[in-house]
Amino acid sequence: MPVKFLIYIPQLIFGGAEKVLVSFANELVFRGHEVEVLELYEKGYLKPQFDARVTFDAICSRAYTEKYYASLAQVKKNPMLLGKLVFSKLVGYRKFAEKLAAKRYAAREYDVAINYLEIESPEFLLNYVKANKYIQWYHTDIANLDNPESSDVMRQAWKRMNAVICVSKDGKNHFIQRYPELAEKTHLIYNFFNQNAILEASEVPYEFPGEHPVLLSVGRMTVPKQYLRFLNVLARLRDEGFEFSWHVLGEGAQRQEIEEKIRILHLEERVFLHGVTDNPYKYMKACDLFVLPSGWEGFPTVTVEAKILGCPVLATDVAGIREQLRHGETGWIVENDETAIYKGLKYLLQNPELCRKLCINEGMEEVCKNEEKYIRFYKLCSIKE
């Protein structure tokens, strides 16, 4: 019996959670269900990767979204009165757009409504969308947030949800520690991955510019990824005579800072910023070592994808990483500080044969295979097939 899902997300950009949403939605329609994706701010970058049967809607149009982010950037650069007035007007338009969307959705009904990212409140779904079940997906680890109190404002809304799904054991445990009253409705389901699509996309030939061994990182240029810290590590190893190049896929608010630090450290011939790509997998397959230097994660999806492609992985000890890798066997896990990253990377550069052994992809069945995740998810939805 087909089930009708509405999945609410702030925007479809090139992020880890957004990419696994593609796999999740495609898995549902593959099994005969209806899926509609609702963006708060229309971006739609990932739309071509969804199954053609997935439908889309947006609360705030693409034209408004572009004006909103342009105005936000101007306010950050020059917070003068005029900029604030323009920005506040655009925020007012969002409220108006939500009222229009509420009228539109009053005539629609769904079996399950999902708030797919914890950074956006589920209030719109709870107040304006008719559904039999409401589910909150929680992709981060609240213990690593600089300001976990910012999540507390959603506490009452989460109490109204039928279930909360966390994507790592650490994430679930820390969520329950902060919100013990939600323990009974909080569950662990790993992200969905389309292994066949990842393997197929990786077959596109690619050769990296620069020195070998090639180090690769994939992720937005934001503070949690700690790319500035990793540049210090690379400069130190360069000064010690090690050969390598580091390639980064992604964009973000820290790009300018990263570019400036590359110049200051004279790493222009060692570090390559490729920007956003719709196919990171051809890069992953061609790299010598995949590096996750993050300060914190909820459950890093890029390391799962790298292991699916047989990449050796060096990763900081963030939430979820020990659910993916066995240190010294299927990956190399280091403490989450600059010195540990330096020592770990230096050791692997000195022992390339160990890197090759770390290509082994074992012990990730629970993380990678979708069947068990699907069964647990439908049990939460109380859907019988």
Model-assigned labels for residue ranges:
Residues 18-23, 213-236, 242, 248, ...:
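A conserved mid-protein helix/loop that constitutes part of the nucleotide-sugar donor-binding site
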Residues 312-315:
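Short hydrophobic beta-strand element within catalytic cores of glycosyltransferases
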Residues 170, 192:
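Carbohydrate-associated surface elements
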Residues 259-275:
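Nucleotide-activated donor-binding/catalytic signature segment of Leloir-type glycosyltransferases, i.e.
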Residues 301-305, 318-328, 332-333:
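Short acidic/histidine- and often glycine-rich active-site loop of Leloir-type glycosyltransferases
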Residues 327-328, 332-338, 347-352:
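Conserved acidic donor-binding segment of nucleotide-sugar-dependent glycosyltransferases
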Residues 364-385:
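C-terminal alpha-helical cap of glycosyltransferases
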Residues 276, 295:
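Aromatic "clamp/platform" in nucleotide-sugar-dependent glycosyltransferases that forms part
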